[in-house]
């Protein structure tokens, strides 16, 4: 332990010395005048040039003398040439001793990795075939005071990558790719829904009554109104108010907040897509979800086969559709239907499986507890799990043939819940009764039970058309499409404990 501490202290002293040297260089730049100029305008991106001129030979480029202006961060400085990086990629810039003044040539030698420069010149190709910019002008735009991570080891400390995402993005192409994919996924989802006549909307983040999901909210205080408020746990009840109002197809992509544990699958602040369509049911949403996921896989991976860890998920095949009840029996053949239909036996199974059983749960909730403990983690390929008991689905419509369950599904891939959807409950009186049952659950000690929302009941009393709604966790979806093991890998700035 002592050796590790000494090594850490030595590294810190070395970094401090490098920072001090860079600050001296910045002081010299300040003495010359404006050390942070902002009058350069580039006309090209590094990777765009690589793509656009990939088929041009050395001779063709020399004859064309194509002028370009690029800018980026120095990732390599050999004195005779540098490699710079912008948001699209990298390109070499050649230090031409014939066209650059002596003062500039001397300055280039003092520039450090991480410095940001502008470069003007013409495109050329090296004998090895690399595209580069033969510079006629180069300037320092921003002096970097902190050294980049060692190029041989990179930024490998996972916690440091999360805490200093800006450095992670500078040095890790894999990280940059992940967040480009995330942006691509969100953009395509938006396009997919708008093409199907959905209207994008925004609903309140601050709410007086948290609702729309079984979760513990963050609480805050509105000073001007002198009242308690909550960060939303879901936008559902507001989106359904919009359906009541006549916006029959709506969606929102935004943040939700849940004051719960942190894990590789959970972050207290996360991004959710929720959409609602009138005159549809949960089966329509299954079809829509399969279509969306296939398009996203094809867009990102060029295939409907999605590699994740040592597995491959097949989005091109029909997703399995199985009820909660049937899935328990399928994946636990030692259990019988009679076991699941007896309250005392179901309670015993749930407790033995590791569920937190309080003792007042009904049969439906116990079945879901058993499912969560004994089945969820076994659902590797895409599964629509349907027919959730009404006790755990306070906002979902009861099934016409079996009122003990609801017209609801959750989508599981790789043992993780990715989406939750149902035919919406539009019976105002039934909704009021279910809210009251949730209040009783909360009084009995369930922190995640819902509050009574009188205004939402009033909205339903005006009449909501038959509607289907769905929520899809964007972060978990991006995890799948980028083969990322932790939700923190796909959130730019995940929540972390304060450093000691």
Swiss-Prot record:
HAMAP family: Lys_tRNA_synth_class2 (MF_00252). GO terms for cellular component: cytosol. It comes from Pseudomonas putida (strain ATCC 47054 / DSM 6125 / CFBP 8728 / NCIMB 11950 / KT2440). Belongs to the class-II aminoacyl-tRNA synthetase family. GO terms for biological process: lysyl-tRNA aminoacylation. Keywords: Aminoacyl-tRNA synthetase, ATP-binding, Cytoplasm, Ligase, Magnesium, Metal-binding, Nucleotide-binding, Protein biosynthesis. The lineage of its organism: Bacteria, Pseudomonadati, Pseudomonadota, Gammaproteobacteria, Pseudomonadales. Mg(2+) 1 binds at residues 410, 417. Homodimer. InterPro entries: Aa-tRNA-synt_II (IPR004364), aa-tRNA-synth_II (IPR006195), aa-tRNA-synth_II/BPL/LPL (IPR045864), Lys-tRNA-ligase_II (IPR002313), Lys-tRNA-ligase_II_N (IPR044136), Lys-tRNA-synth_II_C (IPR018149), NA-bd_OB-fold (IPR012340), NA-bd_OB_tRNA (IPR004365). This is Lysine--tRNA ligase. Binds 3 Mg(2+) ions per subunit. It is found in: Cytoplasm. Its main location: cytoplasm. Its cofactor is Mg(2+). Its EC number is 6.1.1.6. It is an enzyme of class 6 (ligase). One of its GO terms (molecular function) is magnesium ion binding. PROSITE patterns: AA_TRNA_LIGASE_II. It catalyses: tRNA(Lys) + L-lysine + ATP = L-lysyl-tRNA(Lys) + AMP + diphosphate. Mg(2+) 2 binds at residue 417. SUPFAM superfamilies: Class II aaRS and biotin synthetases, Nucleic acid-binding proteins.
């Amino acid at each position: 332990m002592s050796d590790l501490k000494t090594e850490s202290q030595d590294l810190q002293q070395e970094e401090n010395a490098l920072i001090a040297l860079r600050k001296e260089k910045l002081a010299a730049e300040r003495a010359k005048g404006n050390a942070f100029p902002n009058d350069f305008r580039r006309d090209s991106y590094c990777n765009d040039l690589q793509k656009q001129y990939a088929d041009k030979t050395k001779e063709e480029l020399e004859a064309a003398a194509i002028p370009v202006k690029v800018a980026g961060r120095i990732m390599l400085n050999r004195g005779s040439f540098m490699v710079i990086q912008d948001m699209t990629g990298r390109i070499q810039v050649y230090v031409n001793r014939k066209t650059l003044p002596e003062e500039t040539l001397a300055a280039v030698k003092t520039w450090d990795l991480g410095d940001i420069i502008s470069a003007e010149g013409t495109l050329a190709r090296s004998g090895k075939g690399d595209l580069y910019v033969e510079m006629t002008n180069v300037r320092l735009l921003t002096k970097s005071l902190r050294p980049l991570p060692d190029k041989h080891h990179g930024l490998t400390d996972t916690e440091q990558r999360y805490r200093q995402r800006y450095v992670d993005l500078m040095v890790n192409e894999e990280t940059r790719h992940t967040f480009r994919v995330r942006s691509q996924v969100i953009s395509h989802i938006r396009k997919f829904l708008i093409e199907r006549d959905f209207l994008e909307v925004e609903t309140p983040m601050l709410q007086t009554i948290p609702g729309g999901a079984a979760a513990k909210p963050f609480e805050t205080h509105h000073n001007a109104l002198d009242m308690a408020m909550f960060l939303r746990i879901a936008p559902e009840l507001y989106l359904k108010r919009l359906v009541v109002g006549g916006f029959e197809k709506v969606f929102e992509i935004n943040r939700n907040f849940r004051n719960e544990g942190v894990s590789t699958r959970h972050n207290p602040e996360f991004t959710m897509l929720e959409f609602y369509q009138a005159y549809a049911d949960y089966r329509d949403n299954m079809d829509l979800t399969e279509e969306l996921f296939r398009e996203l896989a094809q867009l990102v991976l060029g295939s409907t086969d999605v590699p994740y860890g040592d597995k491959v998920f097949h989005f091109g095949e029909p997703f399995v559709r199985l009820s909660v009840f049937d899935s328990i029996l399928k994946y636990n053949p030692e259990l019988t239907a009679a076991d699941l239909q007896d309250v005392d036996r179901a309670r015993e199974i749930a407790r033995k499986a590791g569920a937190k059983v309080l003792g007042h749960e009904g049969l439906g909730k116990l079945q879901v507890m058993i499912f969560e403990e004994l089945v969820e983690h076994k659902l590797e390929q895409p599964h629509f799990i349907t027919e959730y008991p009404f006790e755990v689905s306070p906002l979902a419509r009861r099934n016409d043939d079996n009122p003990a369950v609801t017209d609801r599904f959750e989508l599981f891939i790789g043992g993780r819940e990715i989406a939750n959807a149902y035919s919406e409950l539009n019976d105002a009186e039934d909704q009021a009764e279910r809210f009251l049952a949730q209040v009783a659950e909360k009084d009995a000690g369930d922190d995640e039970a819902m509050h009574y929302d009188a205004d939402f009941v009033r909205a339903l009393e005006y009449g909501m058309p038959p509607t289907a709604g769905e929520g899809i966790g964007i972060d978990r979806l991006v995890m799948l499409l980028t083969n990322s093991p932790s939700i923190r890998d796909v959130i730019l700035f995940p929540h972390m404990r304060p450093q000691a």
